[in-house]
C-alpha cells in the first residue's frame, strides 16, 4: 500500500448514496436481510460479510440506503449552514441580495475586492432589488418545536423542497461570494437516506449497566428512521428521526441519549477510544515481583502467560526450516495461508487437508519463546521510562518479575503493584521496540542525562559495606564475585590482600576514566560509597559516568554486575537491623522526653504570661499573623533542638559502636535521617495541612479535649510524644487528620494532573527537531537550537558554574564573557544566582587528574577559540549565541585549575564534534519528551504529601501544580500578582498604605454609644500604637469612619469630631441620626461598624514589605525592598510615584505592555519557579512550552488551538466533534504529517526513526557472494575514501 501523504474531506453526494445496491426496506425480518442489521452491511463477530465475503478484521463495512420517496431532508449538522446561505438570497426569486455579483467578473476579483462584495450581500436591505420580485426578504429560523425551517415573522413552515430548489439553483460561479465550497445539494438527502455499515454499531459487546443489549442504540434509531420512511411519513417526522440519530441536542437540551454526535465528542469519543487508544490483543497483566537474577535488559514472564500469548513467525527462506520443526513438535497454534486468505487453528491429532503450503508471506503463531522482545510497563505511564521492551525469560510461580534496578524508573514497589505486558505482532514493530525501547537505549534521562536505572534498598547498604571491606583474601573476593570470579582471576592484578576498592575497580573496569573527587584512572577515590554513587537519577552515579565516558552498554554492564555482586555480598555476609539498633539506649529517649516536656511547659508558661499581660492591658497584643508566626518559630526551635540532640547522639553511637546497623544505613543514605529518627525517638512535631497549622473549628478549638478558644499549642496540632512513646487519643486524631487531607489530595489531584498532562502532550507533540538541529512546529521555526547545544539532552551535563576570579588564566576574556552572560544567571528578581551551567557533554570524565605533560596556555586558548569559531559558523550558523559553551571550556579547562595535555584536549573536542554530528537526529520528538518530563514532575509533586509553601509578599501560595495549571490555562480578566521592588522603602509604604486591607476591629477599639435628645453619640477610643503598628495614620482611620458613615443607608444625618485624650489614646466621636426604624438600624450599624469601616482591597492577606539582598553580580549585592500585591491591572498603580521602582506584572499585563517576547520570558521563569528548588534542569522544557504558548501574536492557552493550521483529525481526537463536520463542509485538504493524522492512515510519523525506511529484500541476501569485495579495484577504494572525507 502506498503511503498516504494528504487527506481530503467532503460530503457524500446524493449520487454516491444512491450508488449502493443494498436496499434497507424492512423493520424486522427472520434472517435480518433488508433490515438495519443486514449482514451485507459488513462482517460482525464470527459472521462473514455477505457483500465481500471477508472477516470483520478485513471488511470495513458497506453503506446501505433507505428510500425517503418525495421528501427532502436537511442533513442535521448543516441546518445552520442552510440558514446562513438563505440569509444571502431572496427566498421568493432565488437571486442574491445584491445586484453587484451579476455585474462583475467574480473570478477576476482579488481577495480584498471579494471581501467587500461579500459585505454587500450581507447588508441589511429590507426588500429584493429584482424588479420582477420586489418582495420583502424573509428571515428563516429552525423551529425546535415544529422540527422544520420557519419564517421568523409569522412562524409559518418553509418547505424543504422550496429551500432545496432555491439553494441548488445558485450558479457555481457565485459560490466563492457565498463561501460555498461544494455543490449545496450535498447538504440535503433526496430520494434516499444512507444507512451506515455495522462497523460503527456492533450488535455484540454493547453494555449498559452490565446488561448485554442485543441492539445497539444507533441501530435502534436507524430502525425508527426506516420505519417512518416505509410508512412514507411527512417531512418533519423523518427530519426529527434523523436529527435524533445524528445530534439530538439540535432539538432537545437535556438529553444524553447515544447519537452520532455524542459518540464522537468529549472524553469517551470513538476516535479516542477505538483508534488512538484502542484495546489490543496479546496482552497480559499480573502482580509484580523482583528477581535479582535477571539482567536489566530482561523480564521474567510466568509460564501461564507464555503459554497463552503467541508471537508470529513469518515464512521466508530463513525461517522455513525452523517452522517445519515446530510443526513436527506440535508447537504451532495457528497457521495463516495468504493465498487462501485463511486462518487455521492447529489442533492435536486433527487432519488438515490442502491448507498448509508454507509459502513466503504465510505466518504461524506459537507460544512466546525465551528472548523474544516484550513491551511491559507500570501504570501510570508518566514518561517513557515507565514503558520498556526487554527480553523474555522463564520465571517461577505466577508473577511478572523485573530486575530491581528498573524499579525506580517505573516507580514500582512490590506491595501488590501490577504490571501489564503486550507482545507486538508486526515484525517491524518488534525490531523497532527492541532498539528504541530497550533499557540500554533508555539508560540516560532525556533532559538531565542522569541514569534512570540503579541500585535500590539493600543493595545500597551492600555497596557501602563492601567498599569498607579490607584484608580480603583472593578466595573471599572470588566468593563475593560469584560468576564474575573467573574474569577477575584473568583480568585483575594479583595481590596478597584485597579491599572493597579493588572490587569496585574491577566492576568499573575502565582504567582511563576520571572525575574530580570521585574516580581517578578507574579507581574510586571518594571516602565512602553512598546512595549518590549507585542510585538512579543522581549526578554522581558511577554508571552515569561510565556511560558518559564510553556508552550505555558499559553503563548497563556495570549496573548488572554491581547488582549481582551486591546481592551476593549480602547473601554471604548478611545485614540485619533490630529494635536495639534503632534505640540502643533508652536513657537517651527518656532524657530527651524530659527535656521536651520541660521546654514545652516553658513555652506554654511564656505564652500564658503574654496572654495575661494583654488581658490586663500591660502590653498591646501582636497581630494575629505575627502571633502565630512567633509561636510557630518557637515550636520549630523545639523541633530543631530534637534534631540537634539526635545528630549529637548519632555521633556518640558511631564512635562507640561503628558497626551499628542503623548508623550504617544513615551513612549509606538509605531510609534513615535525623528528621525521621526525631519522629521515632524525639517528638512527632507540628501537624500541618498545606503548610498551615490546623484551623480551629466550633468554639475556637479543634477537639473537645481542650477548653474553648484555647491557645494551647498541643490543641492546635503540636504532637509532643514520639512514636516510641506512643500517641494519645487526641494526638492520634491530629495525625489522622493530616492523613485524611493527604488522601483526599491524592485522589483529587491524580485526575487533574492527568488531564493537564494529556493537554500539554497534545499541544507539544508535533514539535520536532529538523535536520539543522532547530525546533520546528509544522512549518514554523520555534527555536534556532534544540537543547541550546544542538546535542541530545541525555548527553548534556550540568557542571559547576565557575565565576570569574583573578587567579584564573585568561581572566579578562572570561570576565568579558561573564558580563554578556550574567543577566541570565541572576534570576528571580535578583534573589538567586545560578550555581550550575549547561555543558555540551560531560567532558570531565576524559580529563586526567595526574597529567604530566600539559599544553601551554596560549596553545590551549587558541585551540578552544578555533573550535568555538568553527562550531559557531558551521553548526549554529552565527544565528544563535554559544558564548556559554565558550565560557564552560575557558573556565573548566583553565590551566590554573587543571592540567590538560594536547591528547586530552583533542579527545575532548573530537567527542564534542561527535556529539554535534550524531546525537540529535532530525525528527527527534523533543516536544513529547519535554511535555512528558514536565508532566511527570508536576504529577509527582501534586501527589507528594509534603507541599512546599512560601510567602510571596502577603500571598501565601502552594507551589507546584495549582500555579502551573493557572499559567498554562492563561485565564483573562482575573487578578494578577504584581511585585514591586525598590531601594526606597517609602515608595512601597505608600502603596501598602493604600492597598492593604485594614478594618477598624484590627485596631482593638473601645466603642461606646450614648443616646442624646436628637441623636446618638458613638465614641471610638483607639490606642495610637495600634495605628502605628498597622502603618496607618490617624487621618486614615478618620477617613475609614467617614467613608463608612457617609455611604451607610442606615444613617440620616451625621457629624464627627476627633480628640486626643492622652499620649496613647485618640477618640473619634460620631454624632448620628438613624433612619426609621431607629432601634433596628442602630443595632445593625453597631454590629457592622468594626468590620465595615475599612480601607484597601478586601483580602485575607496582608501586604508585608520584605527586605532582601539582590545580586547585581556574582560578588555584589544591594539591599532592596519588595512588596507583592494582587491587582486586576496596572492602571490601579497609575496615581503613585513609581520612579525607580521595578514593577513585575503578571503574564497578561506583561504582554499588553511589553509584547509577546516579554510574555514568553515571564512565562518560562514563572513555570520553572512553580517546581521549587533543585529542578533547574527543567528550564529547557519550560522554555519550550512558553515558546509554543507565545508562538503567535498573543499567548494561547494549552486548552485551545486558536492559531496555526491544526489538522481536523487532531482536533477530533482532542474532543472536538465539529472538526471533521466543518472540514467536510469546507472541502479541506490536509497533509498527513502530525501524530494524530498518522494514527489513522498507518503512516509512520516523521519523528525519531521515522526518517528511516524499513525495507529488506531477502533475495539479495540469499544471492550474496563472498567474492564481491575482490571486484573493487584500488582506484575505486581511493575514490570512496576521498568522498567520505569530503562528506
From Swiss-Prot:
- InterPro entries recorded: DNA-dir_RpoC_beta_prime, RNA_pol_asu, RNA_pol_N, RNA_pol_Rpb1_3, RNA_pol_Rpb1_3_sf, RNA_pol_Rpb1_4, RNA_pol_Rpb1_5, RNA_pol_Rpb1_clamp_domain
- Where does the source fall among the domains of life? Viruses
Its EC number is 2.7.7.6
This protein's GO CC annotations: DNA-directed RNA polymerase complex; virion component
In alphabetical order, the GO MF annotations are:
DNA binding; DNA-directed RNA polymerase activity
Kindly state a single biological-process term from the GO annotations of this entry: DNA-templated transcription
Q: Tell me any Pfam family this protein matches.
A: RNA_pol_Rpb1_4
What SMART domains does the database record attribute to this sequence? RPOLA_N
Sorted alphabetically, the keyword list is: DNA-directed RNA polymerase, Nucleotidyltransferase, Transcription, Transferase, Virion
The record ties this protein, via SUPFAM superfamilies, to:
beta and beta-prime subunits of DNA dependent RNA-polymerase (SSF64484)
Q: What is its main location?
A: virion
Write out the annotated subcellular location: Virion
Per the record, what are the reactions this protein catalyses?
A: RNA(n) + a ribonucleoside 5'-triphosphate = RNA(n+1) + diphosphate
Q: Which family does it belong to?
A: Belongs to the poxviridae DNA-directed RNA polymerase 147 kDa subunit family.
Partners and quaternary state? The DNA-dependent RNA polymerase used for intermediate and late genes expression consists of eight subunits Rpo30/OPG66, Rpo7/OPG90, Rpo22/OPG103, Rpo147/OPG105, Rpo18/OPG119, Rpo19/OPG131, Rpo132/OPG151 and Rpo35/OPG156. The same holoenzyme, with the addition of the transcription-specificity factor OPG109, is used for early gene expression.
What does this protein do, in the record's words? Part of the DNA-dependent RNA polymerase which catalyzes the transcription of viral DNA into RNA using the four ribonucleoside triphosphates as substrates. Responsible for the transcription of early, intermediate and late genes. DNA-dependent RNA polymerase associates with the early transcription factor (ETF), itself composed of OPG118 and OPG133, thereby allowing the early genes transcription. Late transcription, and probably also intermediate transcription, require newly synthesized RNA polymerase.
- Please report the name of this protein according to its UniProt entry: DNA-directed RNA polymerase 147 kDa polypeptide
Q: Which organism is it from?
A: Fowlpox virus (strain NVSL)
Amino acid at each position: 500500500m502506498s503511503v498516504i501523504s494528504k487527506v481530503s474531506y467532503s460530503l457524500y453526494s446524493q449520487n454516491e448514496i444512491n450508488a449502493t445496491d443494498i436496499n434497507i426496506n424492512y423493520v424486522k425480518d427472520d434472517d435480518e436481510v433488508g433490515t438495519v442489521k443486514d449482514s451485507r452491511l459488513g462482517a460482525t463477530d464470527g459472521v462473514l460479510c455477505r457483500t465481500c465475503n471477508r472477516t470483520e478484521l478485513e471488511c470495513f463495512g458497506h453503506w446501505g440506503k433507505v428510500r425517503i420517496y418525495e421528501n427532502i431532508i436537511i442533513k442535521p449538522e448543516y441546518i445552520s449552514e442552510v440558514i446562513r446561505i438563505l440569509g444571502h438570497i431572496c427566498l421568493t426569486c432565488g437571486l442574491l441580495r445584491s445586484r453587484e455579483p451579476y455585474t462583475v467578473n467574480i473570478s477576476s476579483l482579488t481577495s480584498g475586492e471579494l471581501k467587500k462584495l461579500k459585505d454587500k450581500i450581507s447588508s441589511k436591505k429590507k426588500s429584493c432589488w429584482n424588479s420582477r420580485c420586489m418582495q420583502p426578504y424573509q428571515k428563516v429560523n429552525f423551529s425546535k418545536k415544529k422540527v422544520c425551517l420557519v419564517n421568523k415573522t409569522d412562524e409559518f413552515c418553509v418547505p424543504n423542497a422550496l429551500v432545496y430548489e432555491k439553494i441548488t439553483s445558485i450558479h457555481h460561479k457565485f459560490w466563492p461570494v457565498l463561501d460555498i465550497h461544494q455543490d449545496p445539494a450535498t447538504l440535503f438527502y433526496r430520494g434516499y437516506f444512507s444507512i451506515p455499515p455495522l462497523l460503527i454499531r456492533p450488535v455484540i459487546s454493547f453494555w449498559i449497566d452490565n446488561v448485554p443489549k442485543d441492539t445497539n442504540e444507533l441501530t435502534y434509531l436507524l430502525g425508527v428512521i426506516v420505519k417512518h420512511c416505509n410508512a412514507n411519513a411527512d417531512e418533519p417526522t423523518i427530519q426529527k428521526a434523523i436529527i435524533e440519530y445524528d445530534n439530538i441536542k439540535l432539538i432537545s437540551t437535556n438529553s444524553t441519549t447515544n447519537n452520532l454526535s455524542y459518540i464522537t465528542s468529549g472524553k469517551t469519543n470513538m476516535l479516542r477510544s477505538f483508534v488512538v487508544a484502542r484495546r489490543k490483543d496479546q496482552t497480559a497483566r499480573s502482580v509484580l515481583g523482583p528477581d535479582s537474577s535477571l539482567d536489566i535488559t530482561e523480564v521474567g514472564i510466568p509460564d501461564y502467560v507464555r503459554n497463552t500469548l503467541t508471537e508470529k513467525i513469518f515464512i521466508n527462506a530463513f525461517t522455513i526450516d525452523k517452522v517445519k520443526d515446530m510443526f513436527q513438535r506440535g508447537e504451532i497454534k495457528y497457521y495463516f495461508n495468504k493465498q487462501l486468505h485463511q486462518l487455521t487453528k492447529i489442533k492435536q491429532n486433527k487432519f488438515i487437508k490442502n491448507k498448509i503450503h508454507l509459502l513466503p508471506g504465510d505466518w504461524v503463531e506459537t507460544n512466546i519463546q525465551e528472548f523474544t522482545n516484550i513491551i511491559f510497563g507500570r501504570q501510570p505511564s508518566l514518561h517513557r521510562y515507565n514503558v520498556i521492551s526487554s527480553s523474555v525469560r522463564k520465571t517461577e510461580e505466577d508473577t511478572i518479575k523485573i530486575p530491581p534496578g528498573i524499579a525506580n524508573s517505573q516507580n514500582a514497589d512490590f506491595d501488590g503493584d501490577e504490571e501489564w505486558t503486550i507482545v507486538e505482532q508486526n515484525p517491524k514493530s518488534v525490531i523497532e521496540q527492541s532498539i528504541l525501547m530497550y533499557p540500554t537505549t533508555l539508560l540516560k534521562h532525556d533532559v538531565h542525562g542522569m541514569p534512570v536505572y540503579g541500585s535500590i534498598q539493600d543493595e545500597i547498604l551492600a555497596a557501602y559495606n563492601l567498599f569498607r571491606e579490607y584484608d580480603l583474601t583472593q578466595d573471599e573476593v572470588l566468593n563475593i564475585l560469584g560468576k564474575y570470579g573467573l574474569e577477575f582471576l584473568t583480568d585483575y592484578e594479583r595481590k596478597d590482600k584485597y579491599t572493597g576498592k579493588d572490587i569496585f575497580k574491577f566492576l568499573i573496569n575502565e582504567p582511563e576514566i576520571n572525575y574530580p573527587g570521585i574516580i581517578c584512572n578507574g579507581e574510586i577515590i571518594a571516602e565512602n560509597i553512598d546512595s549518590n554513587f549507585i542510585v538512579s537519577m543522581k549526578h554522581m552515579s558511577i554508571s552515569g559516568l561510565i556511560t558518559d565516558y564510553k556508552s550505555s552498554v558499559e553503563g548497563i554492564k556495570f549496573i548488572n554486575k554491581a547488582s549481582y555482586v551486591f546481592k551476593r555480598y549480602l547473601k554471604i555476609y548478611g545485614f540485619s537491623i533490630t529494635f536495639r539498633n534503632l534505640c540502643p539506649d533508652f536513657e537517651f529517649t527518656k532524657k530527651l522526653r524530659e527535656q521536651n516536656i520541660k521546654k514545652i511547659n516553658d513555652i506554654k508558661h511564656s505564652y500564658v504570661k503574654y496572654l495575661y499581660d494583654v488581658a490586663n492591658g500591660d502590653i498591646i497584643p501582636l497581630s494575629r499573623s505575627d502571633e502565630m508566626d512567633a509561636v510557630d518559630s518557637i515550636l520549630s526551635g523545639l523541633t530543631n533542638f530534637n534534631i540537634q540532640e539526635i545528630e549529637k547522639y548519632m555521633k556518640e553511637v558511631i564512635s562507640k559502636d561503628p558497626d551499628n546497623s542503623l548508623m550504617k544505613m544513615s551513612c549509606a543514605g538509605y531510609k534513615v535521617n535525623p528528621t525521621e529518627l526525631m519522629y521515632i525517638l524525639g517528638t512527632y512535631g507540628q501537624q500541618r495541612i498545606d503548610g498551615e497549622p490546623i484551623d480551629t473549628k466550633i468554639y475556637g478549638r479543634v477537639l473537645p479535649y481542650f477548653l474553648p478558644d484555647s491557645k494551647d499549642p498541643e490543641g492546635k496540632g503540636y504532637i509532643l510524644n514520639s512514636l516510641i512513646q506512643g500517641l494519645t487519643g487526641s494526638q492520634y486524631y491530629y495525625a489522622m487528620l493530616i492523613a485524611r487531607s493527604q488522601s483526599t489530595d491524592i485522589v483529587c489531584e491524580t485526575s487533574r494532573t492527568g488531564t493537564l498532562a494529556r493537554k500539554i502532550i497534545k499541544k507539544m507533540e508535533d514539535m520536532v527537531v529538523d535536520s539543522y538541529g532547530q525546533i520546528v512546529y509544522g512549518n514554523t521555526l520555534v527555536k534556532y537550537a534544540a537543547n541550546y547545544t544542538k546535542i541530545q539532552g541525555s548527553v548534556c551535563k550540568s557542571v559547576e558554574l565557575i565565576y570569574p576570579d583573578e587567579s584564573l588564566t585568561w581572566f579578562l576574556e572570561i570576565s568579558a564573557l561573564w558580563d554578556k552572560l550574567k543577566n541570565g544567571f541572576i534570576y528571580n528578581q535578583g534573589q538567586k544566582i545560578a550555581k550550575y551551567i549547561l555543558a555540551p557533554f560531560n567532558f570531565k570524565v576524559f580529563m586526567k587528574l595526574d597529567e604530566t605533560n600539559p599544553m601551554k596556555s596560549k596553545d590551549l586558548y587558541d585551540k578552544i577559540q578555533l573550535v568555538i569559531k568553527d562550531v559557531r559558523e558551521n553548526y549554529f550558523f552565527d544565528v544563535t549565541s554559544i558564548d556559554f559553551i565558550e565560557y564552560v571550556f575557558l573556565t573548566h579547562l583553565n590551566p590554573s585549575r587543571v592540567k590538560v595535555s594536547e591528547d586530552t584536549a583533542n579527545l575532548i573536542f573530537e567527542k564534542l564534534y561527535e556529539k554535534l554530528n550524531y546525537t540529535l537526529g532530525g525528527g527527534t520528538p523533543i516536544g513529547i519528551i519535554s511535555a512528558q518530563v514536565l508532566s511527570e514532575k508536576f504529577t509527582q509533586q501534586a501527589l507528594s504529601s509534603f507541599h512546599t509553601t512560601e510567602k510571596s509578599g502577603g500571598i501565601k501560595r502552594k507551589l507546584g501544580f495549582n500555579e502551573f495549571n493557572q499559567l498554562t490555562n492563561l485565564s483573562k480578566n482575573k487578578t494578577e500578582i504584581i511585585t514591586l521592588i525598590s531601594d526606597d522603602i517609602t515608595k512601597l509604604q505608600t502603596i501598602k498604605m493604600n492597598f492593604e486591607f485594614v478594618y477598624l476591629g484590627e485596631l482593638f477599639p473601645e466603642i461606646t454609644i450614648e443616646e442624646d435628645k436628637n441623636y446618638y453619640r458613638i465614641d471610638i477610643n483607639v490606642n495610637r500604637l495600634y495605628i502605628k503598628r498597622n502603618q496607618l495614620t490617624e487621618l486614615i482611620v478618620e477617613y475609614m469612619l467617614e467613608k463608612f458613615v457617609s455611604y451607610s443607608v442606615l444613617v440620616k444625618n451625621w457629624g464627627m469630631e476627633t480628640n486626643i485624650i492622652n499620649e496613647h489614646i485618640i477618640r473619634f466621636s460620631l454624632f448620628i441620626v438613624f433612619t426609621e426604624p431607629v432601634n433596628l438600624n442602630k443595632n445593625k450599624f453597631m454590629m457592622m461598624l468594626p468590620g465595615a469601616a475599612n480601607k484597601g482591597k478586601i483580602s485575607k492577606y496582608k501586604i508585608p514589605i520584605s527586605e532582601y539582598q539582590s545580586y547585581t553580580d556574582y560578588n555584589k549585592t544591594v539591599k532592596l525592598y519588595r512588596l507583592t500585591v494582587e491587582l486586576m491591572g496596572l492602571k490601579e498603580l497609575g496615581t503613585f510615584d513609581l520612579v525607580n521602582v521595578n514593577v513585575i506584572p503578571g503574564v497578561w499585563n506583561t504582554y499588553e505592555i511589553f509584547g509577546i517576547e516579554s510574555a514568553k520570558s515571564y512565562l518560562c521563569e514563572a513555570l520553572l519557579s512553580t517546581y521549587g528548588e533543585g529542578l533547574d534542569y527543567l528550564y529547557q522544557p519550560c522554555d519550550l512550552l512558553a515558546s509554543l504558548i507565545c508562538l503567535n501574536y498573543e499567548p494561547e492557552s494549552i486548552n485551545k488551538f486558536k492559531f496555526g493550521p491544526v489538522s481536523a483529525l487532531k482536533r477530533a481526537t482532542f474532543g472536538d466533534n465539529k472538526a471533521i463536520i466543518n472540514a467536510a463542509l469546507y472541502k479541506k485538504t490536509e497533509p498527513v504529517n502530525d501524530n494524530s493524522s498518522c494514527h489513522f492512515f498507518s503512516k509512520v510519523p516523521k519523528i525519531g526513526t521515522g526518517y528511516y525506511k524499513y525495507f529488506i529484500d531477502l533475495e539479495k541476501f540469499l544471492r550474496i557472494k563472498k567474492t564481491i569485495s575482490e571486484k573493487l579495484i584500488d582506484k575505486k577504494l581511493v575514490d570512496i575514501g576521498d568522498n567520505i572525507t569530503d562528506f
